Amino acid sequence: MCSRTRKVKYFMFITTTEKHKILDFKLFKVKFKNKHCKNSSVKNYGKNNTIKNKESYLSGLQIHFYGNNNKVIIEKGSTFSNFTFNFGLFNHPVNNCEIFIGKNCYLNWGNIDILTDNCVVKIKENTSIQNLHARLPHKKSSITIEKNSMLSWGVQIIPHDGHDIINLNDEKTINDCEYQIKIGEHCWIGSDVKLIHSATIPKNSIVGANSLVNKEFNIENAIYAGVPAKLIRNNITWKE
């Protein structure tokens, strides 16, 4: 089933290993295009959900679809360990969302939880991630991590406040907007950093451990740190 590109029809849960395949639960359609999916698992509780995998091993990745018209695109050479993509929840489906993983990325331990419609997550090529917890609770929000970046242990990314904030005078929601978190090319995000609202980290920058980033920064080649984060030093770069 997983040796070549093809359409796999009518399953909600599929687990594959080198020696055997297990198919369970009710029957739904899903388009599953990949060459290397040993030890991968997919739960599909919707329709027209797609996975396009270009020669990356999905061992260590779980994908859960709760909703319709969602897609996962994984470029060549990316690997996963104990990582999960959640499109919605069992009683809270989401539609028209996308997760894109570029070439030669490494995602070790963590989850990306998309909790509302029309959200996008893009992780560009040669990015490494350790124990990421990303949640998209608001419609049309997005997370973009540019190429050659590194996220240390315990990073949290939430493009929203988590709950609606209401103005008591007119009962209108004051934080109802499209949040976009952006991490620039070749950035190093330290351990236990939190990025919220529409946080933006410029190219070639570092964010110090335990920092809270809640706004857009625009000076490249800089160090940002603190709660909330602020510019600490500029005219720097870093290497592994």
Language model feature labels by segment:
Residues 200-225:
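C-terminal/domain-terminus segments
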Residues 63, 89-90, 213:
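Beta-strand elements of modular eukaryotic interaction domains
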Residues 71-200, 227-228, 235-236:
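Flexible, glycine/small-residue-enriched loop-and-beta-strand segment within the central core
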Residues 1-83, 148, 154-155, 162-166, ...:
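Terminal amphipathic alpha-helical/low-complexity segments used for targeting or macromolecular assembly
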Residues 194, 212-214, 231:
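Generic hydrophobic alpha-helical segments
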